[in-house]
A protein has these predicted regions:
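N-terminal active-site segment of His-dependent metallophosphoesterases
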Residues: 1-21
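Active-site glycine-centered loops adjacent to acidic/histidine catalytic or metal-binding residues
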Residues: 11-12, 40-41, 113, 145-146
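Binuclear metal-dependent phosphoesterase catalytic core
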Residues: 158-231, 237
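Histidine-centered catalytic micro-motifs
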Residues: 110-115, 140-150
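Long, low-complexity serine/threonine/glycine- and acidic-rich segments characteristic of extracellular
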Residues: 226-230, 234-262
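Residue-level marker for buried hydrophobic side chains located in beta-strands
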Residues: 7-9, 37, 110, 143
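Extended active-site neighborhood of metal-dependent phosphoesterases/phosphodiesterases
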Residues: 19-104, 128-141, 149-184
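Short acidic, glycine-rich surface-loop motifs adjacent to enzyme active sites
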Residues: 10, 101-119
Length: 262
């Protein structure tokens, strides 16, 4: 209900059952926005070739699209449970032609199930004679999922971003979550996790057990009121309060609380 520009699954949709069910329940019609997928190593299943089922359900394993001033590129993982019908040379040839057509200074964000490089080089390598240096473009980030943990790293100006599994958390024991990524008008990237499966909840932090928050300046006739709120499906827009006498339920004060965090 926050109208994202698109949703993307970064791979390991997972084997035949996962590939089939995701196609039915997580798509543009059910999510009310564009939905994209990357192919993961566990999506290369038995068939005439590893990506055959994926292609029949989701389409090409590599593709690109533009939103605003950002060019988004999805490429397939180069290894998996079953052999692929494509090679890194095939991907290189397409990628070279695709990037040759982007606008000058257009921001570039890359998706692949696996991390391209653990160091700062950011070179796509088919072989020693076929290399693409992503640093020669306005590359902002590579977003991946193969490690199944929650991790964000700035690799000398290019972010690498990984997110754990939505329905069961990460290998690093992080809780179930999904990731929100924002790209502003200047192509700057910010990201935060949104914890999954949490129904609307509110907890009074202050006053509590005859104690009040100390991290604020108040006068004798003031009472600091602090609450925590959370809901997986939406951010809190505002919190209103009514303070009443516990003996006669008479209203003492009411108003709206000021947001101190996001």
């Amino acid at each position: 209900n926050e109208k994202p520009a698109f949703l993307i699954h970064t791979g390991d949709i997972c084997y035949e059952p996962g590939l089939t069910i995701h196609n039915q329940v997580v798509n543009a019609q059910t999510m009310d926005c564009p939905v994209y997928y990357c192919i993961g190593n566990h999506d290369l299943v038995k068939g005439n070739y590893g990506e055959e089922l994926y292609e029949s359900l989701y389409g090409p394993t590599w593709y690109s699209f533009d939103i605003g001033n950002v060019h988004y590129v999805v490429t397939p993982i180069d290894h998996g449970d079953n052999p692929t019908n494509y090679t890194q040379k095939d991907v290189y040839n397409w990628l070279k032609n695709d990037l040759a057509l982007i606008k000058k200074d257009q921001a570039l964000i890359l998706f692949n199930h696996d991390l391209f490089t653990p160091n700062d080089s950011f070179v796509f390598k088919a072989d020693d004679d076929h290399l693409l240096d992503f640093r020669s473009f306005n590359t902002k980030a590579q977003i991946y999922g193969h490690m199944h943990y929650n991790y964000v790293r700035n690799q000398n100006g290019i972010y690498t971003i990984c997110t754990g599994t939505l329905d069961k958390g990460g290998i690093d024991h992080s809780p179930s979550s999904f990731r929100e990524i924002k790209v502003d008008a200047n192509d700057n990237i910010t990201t935060q996790l949104r914890y999954a499966f949490i129904e609307p909840q509110i907890a009074i932090v202050s006053p509590m057990n005859n104690q009040t928050a100390a991290a604020c300046t108040i006068t004798e006739d003031q009472l600091p009121v602090s609450v925590n709120t959370y809901y997986s499906q939406a951010k809190t827009s505002h919190v209103s309060y009514i303070l009443s006498d516990s003996e006669n339920n008479q209203e003492i004060a009411k108003g709206d609380l000021a947001s101190r965090t996001d």
